């Protein structure tokens, strides 16, 4: 059964991540307005809740629930640069800036110990893949150019990230203790890794 998530009349929207706990369904996303910025939000059992950000707008890209707290990762535009952030129960927390670079938070995972792990990247003309562990930035030293991290998963004591690098041709990768490239079978096509699960 398809469930249409409500947004203001005639606006387009995107659902970016989903989390299910018992009978509760949490969905992160954002919607466009006719004249204003993009609005980050989440839906709980079909009810929409807008998330605070600057007047430049933002996107909510990943959602998780831990010990009753609704935690959402994303980013927003502060008028000068894009700023990676997360919301916990509707309160926005900025992740540390890296100089004057844009920063983006794409995915989050809560570790068994309750640590908030967020994957993303930073940079302007070039990028660096990274993740934040409770706000502390840790770079992923990916070998290729323009790397980004799209996904993260905490398993045991390990932190796994997945993403891609490259420009004209992209190569998907995942990283645990070292980089593992996910090259296409015939070597001719681009690949992206956009989510990761460890069992």
How should each PLM-predicted stretch be described?
Residues 1-199:
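Residue-level hotspots at or immediately adjacent to binding/recognition sites across diverse folds
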